[in-house]
C-alpha cells in the first residue's frame, strides 16, 4: 500500500488538510512516480486538463520517476501534453525508462530537465503473445505498428533519425543525464530549481 502524506494549510478560515499531490497541483505540478498504467494515465490526464482550464497559458510541470508501463496509457498522456496550449516543463528524477523517457522528451523544447543522477532508457515495445496463429499474427502486427509510432515520436522529440532510434531501441539503451542531452532527450541537467526557467517552483 502506498502511503500518501498530507499537508495542513492555514486558509484564513481555519486549517485545511489535503494530500501532497493535491497541494502540488495548486502550483501546477504533476507527479508521475510509478508504472504508467491506464488508471494512472486517466488521473494525470484529468490533472492536465484541469490545469489547462484554470489557465491555458501558464506552464505546467511534470516530474517523472517511472520505469515505464503500458504503451497506450503513455500515448494517451503524450497526446494530452501535445493538446495543451501551454508549455510543459518535464523533469526526470531518478529514472525515466521506456514510456517514461518518451514523456520526458515530450516536454516543451528548452524546458526538459534531468537531475544529475537520473537515468533514462529507451527500448522497443514488447508483449506476451498467446492464442491461435491468427491471433499471434495480429498481435505481432500491432507491436510492429506501435514500434513505428514510438520511433517516429522519439525521432521528432529528440531530433535523431528514425533509423538511429530503431537501432538503439533494439535493446535496452541506457543514458545518464549528460548523455541524454547529447541524444536530444532533454535540454539541461539541473541540480537546483533556480537553474530552471520555471517560475512556479522557484521562490
From Swiss-Prot:
**Under the GO molecular function aspect, what terms does this record hold?**
ATP-dependent peptidase activity; ATPase binding; serine-type endopeptidase activity
Q: Which reaction does it catalyse?
A: Hydrolysis of proteins to small peptides in the presence of ATP and magnesium. alpha-casein is the usual test substrate. In the absence of ATP, only oligopeptides shorter than five residues are hydrolyzed (such as succinyl-Leu-Tyr-|-NHMec, and Leu-Tyr-Leu-|-Tyr-Trp, in which cleavage of the -Tyr-|-Leu- and -Tyr-|-Trp bonds also occurs)
What class does this enzyme belong to in the EC scheme? hydrolase
What the entry lists under InterPro entries is as follows: ClpP, ClpP/crotonase-like_dom_sf, ClpP/TepA, ClpP_His_AS, ClpP_Ser_AS
Query: One of this protein's GO BP terms?
Result: protein quality control for misfolded or incompletely synthesized proteins
Q: Name one GO cellular component term.
A: cytoplasm
Main subcellular location? cytoplasm
Subunit structure and binding partners: Fourteen ClpP subunits assemble into 2 heptameric rings which stack back to back to give a disk-like structure with a central cavity, resembling the structure of eukaryotic proteasomes.
Family, as annotated:
Belongs to the peptidase S14 family.
What this protein is called in its record is ATP-dependent Clp protease proteolytic subunit 2
